[in-house]
């Protein structure tokens, strides 16, 4: 990615542009002293309607403040041909020619420097706090505990009420600004920020960055993102830093074209896994990836592959780690058997449709059924010492805490590119016991018996997030449903969050399904 997010930035970068930008950040965005805060409160009103709210932006070319929501700043940009403005709440730069928030390396550096200065002024200003009360802390750094003063203890006695998180609390719900076809990223961010154990990890400040440049660490950025989500702010967040880091570390996702949400999920988990060095607690890893980072602790499972020789019935077993399970659907070019009773595949308007109901369990049964590899895929059997036909069967050796199921709705081949719109019924609660390697081995040995409650509970999951794709393969949009509390669901459509019913969730098409274990064993 080039240092400049768009070519229109160059028209602003003339003599003294850095100093001019610093003044705007110091006076109107990052207000570090009481004086600058008073100036901001007095000066920052829309020059057209006089409002303080409605996402005020400041023109970068002249002294003009305008509402973004009511498009007063847009009118100014059009009339004066001043194409760049700055968000006075978050500091993001908006280009009216690109019609999007942009990233520029030089301008971002100025913003970070001024934000850091303002933060220091807020923390160490004698007018605000006593110097011994606070220490500057960063993500993953040590911090001193809060020791209340005598005055603060008196105030606490007079104000015994505390803020409680109730079932109606909306902390953690926050929209995300679409930065130009970035709905694929926004829906995954919503799923990750509502993953309970991941939330607990980041909000407890447990990441210790060991990268030479913390500014390039995706885990540090995720820590900041979680703090933003659970800060109580309700205005949409602008994830431009996250987008830039993803583009930097996963270059195949760079650019403003629409990307695949599943591909982004895997790329994000991979980068987070690589950047989690230093977070290992020193204990032996209890997952097939042999890594104790938070990503592998939560998302890594073990997939067992048994290849059985058709002559001597010898079995060769391998176990591979996985972060997700991709499932074929009826209507794809891959044969799908068995379908639920009454199913009938067909093609309508170039897209695949199936009558009847296909369930997630159907897809999992197909995924774990024995598959004959055929004469063209003979393997050398270690028992027969010769090439023989064989069967292959996949089962779950170890289940992850969070199981992500990818319904393969996009089919790409030399002759065909299409979206499969088959409706797949998925449950709110899922029992993975029938698909475990241990269940298969017990059945083969004729020793299958009902598992104990503790073992059975270990394989039970609850749905907590669903990612959907609306539209066609060429033109579509991603949204997500997330569970905030038990049986309380919300639809996340970029910056817009709306309440949803359970029926809305289970009636949706489904592209990525996120399930969380109902019972956890703590080591």
Swiss-Prot record:
EC number: 3.4.19.12
Superkingdom: Eukaryota
Gene3D superfamilies according to UniProt: Cysteine proteinases, Zinc/RING finger domain, C3HC4 (zinc finger)
Annotated residues for binding of Zn(2+) 2: 46, 49, 67, 72
Active site: residue positions: 183 (nucleophile), 477 (proton acceptor)
Keywords in alphabetical order: Activator, Cell cycle, Chromatin regulator, Hydrolase, Metal-binding, Nucleus, Protease, Thiol protease, Transcription, Transcription regulation, Ubl conjugation pathway, Zinc, Zinc-finger
Top EC category: hydrolase
GO cellular component, one term: nucleus
Binding site for Zn(2+) 3: 59, 62, 76, 82
CDD domains per the UniProt record, alphabetical: Peptidase_C19D
Zinc finger (UBP-type): 4-121
Compartments in which it is found: Nucleus
Catalyzed reactions: Thiol-dependent hydrolysis of ester, thioester, amide, peptide and isopeptide bonds formed by the C-terminal Gly of ubiquitin (a 76-residue protein attached to proteins as an intracellular targeting signal)
InterPro entries cross-referenced by the UniProt entry: Papain-like_cys_pep_sf, Peptidase_C19_UCH, Ub_carboxyl-term_hydrolase, USP_CS, USP_dom, Znf_RING/FYVE/PHD, Znf_UBP
GO molecular function: cysteine-type deubiquitinase activity; zinc ion binding
Family of the protein in this entry: Belongs to the peptidase C19 family. UBP8 subfamily.
Known partners and oligomeric status: Component of some SAGA transcription coactivator-HAT complexes.
Cited function: Histone deubiquitinating component of the transcription regulatory histone acetylation (HAT) complex SAGA. Catalyzes the deubiquitination of both histones H2A and H2B, thereby acting as a coactivator. Recruited to specific gene promoters by activators, where it is required for transcription.
Protein name listed in UniProt: Ubiquitin carboxyl-terminal hydrolase 22-B
């Amino acid at each position: 990615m080039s240092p400049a997010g768009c070519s229109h930035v160059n028209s602003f970068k003339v003599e003294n542009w850095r100093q001019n930008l610093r003044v705007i950040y110091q006076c109107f965005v990052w207000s570090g002293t009481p004086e600058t805060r008073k100036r901001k409160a007095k000066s920052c009103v829309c020059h057209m309607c006089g409002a303080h709210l409605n996402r005020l932006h400041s023109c970068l070319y002249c002294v003009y403040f305008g509402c973004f929501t009511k498009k007063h700043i847009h009118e100014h940009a059009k009339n004066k041909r001043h194409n760049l403005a700055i968000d006075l709440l978050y500091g993001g730069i908006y280009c009216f020619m690109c019609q999007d928030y942009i990233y520029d390396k030089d301008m971002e550096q100025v913003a970070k420097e001024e934000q850091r200065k303002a933060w220091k002024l807020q923390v160490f200003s004698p007018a605000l706090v006593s110097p011994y009360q606070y220490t500057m802390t960063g993500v993953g750094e040590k911090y001193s505990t809060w020791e209340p003063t005598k005055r603060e203890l008196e105030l606490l006695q007079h104000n015994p009420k505390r803020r409680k998180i109730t079932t109606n609390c909306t902390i953690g719900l926050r929209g995300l600004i679409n930065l130009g076809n970035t709905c694929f990223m926004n829906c995954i961010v919503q799923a990750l920020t509502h993953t309970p154990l991941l939330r607990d990890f980041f909000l407890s400040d447990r990441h210790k960055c060991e990268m030479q440049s913390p500014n390039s660490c995706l885990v540090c950025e995720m820590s900041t993102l979680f703090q933003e989500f659970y800060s109580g702010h309700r205005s949409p967040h602008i994830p431009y830093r996250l987008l830039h880091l993803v583009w930097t570390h996963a270059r195949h996702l760079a650019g403003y074209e629409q990307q695949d949400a599943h591909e982004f999920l895997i790329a994000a988990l991979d980068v987070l896994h690589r950047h989690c060095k230093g977070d290992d607690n020193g204990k032996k890893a209890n997952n097939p990836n042999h890594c104790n980072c938070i990503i592998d602790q939560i998302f890594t499972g073990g997939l067992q592959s048994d290849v059985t020789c058709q002559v001597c019935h010898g079995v060769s077993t391998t176990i591979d780690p996985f972060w997700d399970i991709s499932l074929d659907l009826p209507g794809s070019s891959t044969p799908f058997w068995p379908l639920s009773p009454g199913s009938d595949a067909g093609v309508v308007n170039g897209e695949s449709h199936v009558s009847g109901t296909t369930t997630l369990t159907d897809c999992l049964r197909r995924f774990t059924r024995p598959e004959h590899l055929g004469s063209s895929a003979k393997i050398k059997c270690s028992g027969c010492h010769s090439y023989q036909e064989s069967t292959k069967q996949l089962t779950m050796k170890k289940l992850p805490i969070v199981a992500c199921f990818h319904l393969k709705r996009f089919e790409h081949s030399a002759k065909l590119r299409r979206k499969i719109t088959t409706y797949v019924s998925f449950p709110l609660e899922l029992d993975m016991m029938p698909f475990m390697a241990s269940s298969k081995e017990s059945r083969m040995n004729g020793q299958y018996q009902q598992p104990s409650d503790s073992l059975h509970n270990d394989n039970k999951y609850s749905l907590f997030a669903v990612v959907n794709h609306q539209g066609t393969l060429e033109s579509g949009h991603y949204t997500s449903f997330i569970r905030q509390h038990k049986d309380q669901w919300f639809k996340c459509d970029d910056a817009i969050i709306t309440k949803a019913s359970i029926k809305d969730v289970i009636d949706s098409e489904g592209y990525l399904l996120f399930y969380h274990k109902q019972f956890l064993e703590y080591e």
